[in-house]
Each structure stands twice: as structure tokens, then as C-alpha cells.
Amino acid sequence: MKNFLFFLACCLLSTGAFAHLGNLAGTVYDQTTNQPIRGVTVQITGLNRATTTNELGQYRFVGLVAAPYKIELSHLGFATQLINVIVQDDQTATVRTVLTTAPVELGEVTISSGRAHDQQLISNLDIKLRPITNSQEVLRLVPGLFIGQHAGGGKAEQLFLRGFDLDHGTDIQLTVDGMPINMVSHAHGQGYADLHFVIPELIEGVDFKKRPYNAEKGNLATAGWVNFRTRTALDRSFVKLEGGQFDTFQAVAGLDLLGEKGGTASRNRKNQSAYLASEYSFTNSYFDNPQHFNRLNVMGKYHGHIGANTNLTLTGSTFWSKWNHSGQIPDRAIESGLTGFFGSVDPTEGGETSRTNFNAQFVTVTPRNNLIKNQVFYGNYGFELYSNFTFFLRDSINGDQIRQKERRNLFGYNGSYITESTIGKTHFTTTLGAQYRQDITGGKNGATPTELSYTRNRTETLERAKYGNINEINAALYADELVELSDRFTVNAGVRVDYFRSQYTDLLLQPAQTGRARQAIVSPKLNLYYTLNPRVQLYLNTCKGFHSNDARVVVPQGEPLRRTREILPGAYGSDLGVIFKPFPRLIVNAAAWYLWLAQEFVYVGDEGVVELSGKSRREGVDLSVRYQLTKTLYFDLDLNTANPRSIGDKIG
């Protein structure tokens, strides 16, 4: 009994001691737009404690001994600011800071254990420095990712990363402000991702990671994921006109709708902002058969603060594009004089696509400083593409032109709850999340079936190879725990559970037949970060990822695929790397990686057939270097190697 009373007294004394600690809370704003800034690095100098601001520009330190502190705030494109703060017992010191824009300085980049899980130093730097003329080109900012266009500028680009031919997005998850770009069970191919509906001048930042080491990232993130963040507000209205050869011109305009009328909720803070932007492009290009390429984009965005700790963001956009393209031509066709180098075998190739989006995001900080995010999105998407890859191989009379067509509705929800706590010197960040997405083609809601047909000159349908309605659901729950065990060592563990239901109605059968396939998958994650000093950080990332298969594969093959788990083939991988900053103006990021992918069945959208893709193994090394030579001159280097191998196949 005496021992118990002694233990209880010690607990009460320790609790009392902790109760006399103080806290520090602050908010950071952009001087130009008067809007909060997310991702600002906030460090307490001398303590090696750091954090980053959230979506509301807020940060918080808890459990500080009563004393004066010097706080350093830094962010790319802004001048670093030092402030002095006095923390008192049992009180929370509040700070409001305004950052001013400044030329990009590599010296502003910090390596911190407090932001280990979301450090993307290379990407954040590149987006500030490189000129961008096309939204798809932004993907090149991801070191090791490159793109290729082979269908006239209107079709989504071909993507390649870490030994993957990603086709048009099969193994990379792309989002804009959290809204999905990839189209599952698409008429052209699984995961098709057309980013052309994003106006490049409105891109504020790019978040990315190779492999889905975050529990938040699920389907299609086998090789990696990229999220584009559009600007919350315009600092000024703008107009840009460009012109060039071959009847090429482009016009881009952005209009700040509220300006100073946005109201002031508090000093240095706008209550709301809104803008409208549009882009139009046209070119005939240099081919013998004019492209007649047209693209129109319109986007509007509203951002408002509902109270001091809540904001609402509404985004609407619409996109339309139409074009002709010359297609591929064989060398012998040029050598024989059948067509010129800039000619075409089938001059009727081309396409038309459109997309309309609505995105609503609601972010709030509770009285206990927990962060709640809610997002709902809706998209209406249309696609019609005419291609001819084999000319007259299949049909020597009419040719081999195909039409891939669909119109779909997609909608979904992303939600998360983030809470932070401290036990002794250990800091915990807990995230719980839920996601839902549904894609529907055909039906009674203005959508048309997913189609693959053989055609002639775009005008005549010769035969339908695939024609049916797709209804696909992906629901997921995830949990993520980030534990800062010390000022140097951080552990992140997470788990994700995904459920898929694929439904396909084959309209070529009489009567039409509907089939369904269901499957769930569990994806664990484990990441370790060790910061040797403010210049060196080591990390080990491990995870399981996956991508779903096309509904036209999993429904007909159904039960056999479910038993062998090939509806959702798993991908296991790891990264071992270092972020190194030997000098203020030099950053080096190097990593060795490994990836193993399970056997799967792949739907070939151009032929309407199913191909067996066996197990595979990939390994390689990534190296990225950024060096600032002068205030206005920068050097960058990306070296990436990949060694993909098929497992189990005979050599040759």
C-alpha cells in the first residue's frame, strides 16, 4: 500500500510539472495575397524542433519550458524571417507572421526530422524555377519521370518511371487538389490520365513520391503518385498572348474577382478570394494533314474563411479539346513514296475529349487543435479517339481504324482526421482517413457505354468489338502514425484497406448480361527517418501497393482471378536513401530502390483482348543534384537507372 501511494504521489508531481509547461501557436500569411501559406518550415533554433504549417497556415509547439525562444520561418520563394517569442508557464503564446516574396535561394531549403514524411525538396525547388507551357510537362519535374506524345497533342501523354511503361497512367496515381485524374477501366486503357484540363499558370505546387509510402495513397500508385496544387488566390489579374509558326497561338487570362473587396477577417488576412481563368490554344502544326488542334479551358475558384479556424474552397472547371493527328508511319511508306515524312497513311485519325469538374474542400481546426478535412468531387468526362496502328493488316479493304469512346460520371469523397499528442519527449501525429470513388459509364445519366469499334474514315462503324456499361466502386479506410521518437529519429507506420466492386454489362450479348467481381486488399507501410544533423537525413521506406485491373478483365474472369488475387495484384517495394546538403547552395538526394510486382492479367484497350503479364522485379538507383551557382543561375542533374526483369520466363 505504501508503495502504491508513493507511486501515485510521483505521478501527481510529474503531472504538475508538465502542467507548468507552455505552448507556442502561430499562423503564417503571404504578404502579396494575404492568404495563409501551407508548408512553411518553422524551427525553434537551438532545440532542433521543427514543424510545418497546415492548410490554414497554422503551426503549434507544445510542452515548452518557460523561456524566450528564437523562431525561424522559411519557405521557397519567400524571405526567411526570424522572430523572438516569450513562452510563459500554463499559457499559449500566439504569433502572426507575414512572409514577403523573394528570389529562390537554395539556402532557404531545410532538412528537418519534423517534416521527414513529406519532404520533397527537389520538386518544390523546380516548380519555382522552370518555365511551364503545358500542364503535362509539369510531370517532368518528378526526377526520373519522362513523357512522350504520339497522337497530336490532344491525347494524354505516354508516361515512363522506374522501369515502368506506365502507358497513360496505369501505375502512377495523378490528382489535382486531391481530385483524381486517372480513369479506371477507361476505353483506351486502365488508369488513363489526361492532365490537359489544368491551366499551367494556375499550378502553385507539386507534391510527389515514388511508390505509395503514404497510407493515404492507394490504387494505381504502384510506381508513384503526383498531386498538383492550384493557386488559392491570384496576386493580380493577368493576360498572356503567344504566337508562332504553323498557325500556332495561345491566349491565357486570369481575373481576380474580389481583389481588395475580399474583406478582412483580421489584420493581414483576407476573408475570401475568388478568381476566374481561361486558356485557349490552336495550331495546325507542321504535318501535311493540318491538325486543327483546339483546346479550351475555363476554371473558377473560391476560397473563404468561415471563422478563424475553418476554410472552404470551391473549384469548378470545364475543358474541351479536338484534333487530327498524323499517326505512326512505317519507313517503307516514305521510301516507296506512298507518303512524305510529315504525311500520314490514315488522315482521318484524331479525337475529341472533354471534362467538367466540381471540387469542394472543407478544412477545420477543432478547439483541441485537431485537423479535419472533408472533400467531395464530381466529374463528367467524355472521350472519343480514332486510331489506326496497323493500317491494313486486319482488314485489307476497309483498313484497321478503331474508335475508342466513352462518357462517364465519377464522384467521390476524401476525408481525414489528424490529431497530435506528446508523451514526454515523443511526439505523435495520428491520421485516420476514409475514401470513396465510383465511376459509371452508360446508364440513364447522360453517360454513354464504353466502346471499342472498327470504323472507316470516322464516319462508318464496321464492327463493335467491345460495348458495355461499367460501374466500379473503390472504398478505402486507412490509418497512419508518425512518431518523432527524438529530435533525430522518426518512425512512420500505416495500413490501408481497399475494397473494390467491378461491374460490367455486356451490351453485345442478347439479352445484355451483367457480371460483378469483388476483392479487398490490405496494404501496410513502414518508413524510418534519421536526421544526423541539419545537413544529412537518412531514410528507409517500405510498403505494399497495387493497381486495380480493368473491369472488362476481372468480371469475365471473375472467380479464377479472385482466388489467385490477380484482381488486385500486389506490388512490394522499398527505398533506401539520403538527403544531403553539404553546402548552403547544394542539395543532393540519392536512393537505391527495389520493387516486386505480382502476376496480373492486362486488358489491351486497342485490341479488346486480355494478355497475361507475369511476375516482375525492378531495381535501380536515383540521383538528383541541385546547385545554385549565382543568385540567378542554377544547375540541376537527374540520373536514374532501372533494371526491370520478368520473373519465371525462359531467357530468350
Where are these regions (language model features)?
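Short acidic/polar hinge/loop motifs at secondary-structure boundaries
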Residues: 62, 179-210, 228-229, 300
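Short strand-turn segments of transmembrane beta-barrel domains in outer membranes
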Residues: 207-215, 224-259, 278, 575
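Extracytoplasmic beta-strand/coil segments of soluble accessory domains associated
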Residues: 136-183
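Gram-negative outer-membrane beta-barrel transporters
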Residues: 417-418, 591-596, 612-652
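Structural signature of Gram-negative outer-membrane beta-barrels, strongest in the C-terminal barrel
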Residues: 307, 426-431, 435-437, 468-597, ...
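Face-selective signature of the C-terminal outer-membrane beta-barrel domain
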Residues: 305-320, 351-507, 586-592, 636
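Short, acidic, small-residue-rich periplasmic hinge/interaction motif at the N-terminus
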Residues: 29, 33, 41-45, 74-78, ...
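Transmembrane beta-barrel wall of Gram-negative outer-membrane proteins
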Residues: 245-282, 287-326, 350-370, 424
